[in-house]
């Protein structure tokens, strides 16, 4: 396992961020903090890229300019998207739409590689946070990290692959937690 300071890649992340339209109804500023989400995603991508044991397309390891769309929405909106793209007439917690695959071609130097889009229902996230007795912040991190792994080619077609993916999400959230502690103490993550 690599330490946080080894093999650092300087990632330039273009985050196309769409905040939750009803943010004023929820007493939480975390999910509308674009800078925080950019930081979280960069830490997670950096960890995946520099560790050869984890699934990550070679193209993602080879470029430093990456772009992700992140949108927070409500159950009604995500249900429409879920119906359109997955033929499921129900809200879901997170949807991801990967753009790259193993055959993708690297963009020209200093151009961004589009990874895809992550869409999260804040309403479903709040319900799941309540059910699991943890914060909305933690649930949103869980869902966004799950969506990111799908953008990087992870999938859960069976229980074993789901367990692996969920275990890796735990690692990403722990790395994120450790980085936030380091920053709060004035240390470089």
Swiss-Prot record:
Binds 1 zinc ion. Its EC number is 3.1.-.-. One of its GO terms (cellular component) is cytoplasm. InterPro entries: MetalPrtase_cat_dom_sf_prd (IPR023091), YbeY (IPR002036), YbeY_CS (IPR020549). One of its GO terms (biological process) is rRNA processing. It is found in: Cytoplasm. Keywords: Cytoplasm, Endonuclease, Hydrolase, Metal-binding, Nuclease, Ribosome biogenesis, rRNA processing, Zinc. Pfam families: YbeY. Single strand-specific metallo-endoribonuclease involved in late-stage 70S ribosome quality control and in maturation of the 3' terminus of the 16S rRNA. HAMAP family: Endoribonucl_YbeY. Belongs to the endoribonuclease YbeY family. This is Endoribonuclease YbeY. It comes from Prochlorococcus marinus (strain MIT 9211).
């Amino acid at each position: 396992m690599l330490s946080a300071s080894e093999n650092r890649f300087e990632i330039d992340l273009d985050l196309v961020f769409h905040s939750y339209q009803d943010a004023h109804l929820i007493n939480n500023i975390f999910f509308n903090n674009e800078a925080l989400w950019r930081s979280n995603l960069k830490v997670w991508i950096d960890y995946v890229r520099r560790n050869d044991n984890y699934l990550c397309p070679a193209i993602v390891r080879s470029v430093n300019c990456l772009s992700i769309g992140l949108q927070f929405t409500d159950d009604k909106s995500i249900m429409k998207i879920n119906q359109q793209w997955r033929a499921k007439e129900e809200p879901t917690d997170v949807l991801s739409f990967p753009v790259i695959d193993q055959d993708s071609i690297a963009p020209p130097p200093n151009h961004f590689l589009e990874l895809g889009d992550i869409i999260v229902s804040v309403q479903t996230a709040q319900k799941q946070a309540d059910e699991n007795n943890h914060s909305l912040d933690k649930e949103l991190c869980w869902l966004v990290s799950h969506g990111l792994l799908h953008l990087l080619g992870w999938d859960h077609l069976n229980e074993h692959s789901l367990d692996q993916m969920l275990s890796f999400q735990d690692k990403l959230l722990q790395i994120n937690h450790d980085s936030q502690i380091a920053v709060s103490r004035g240390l470089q993550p």
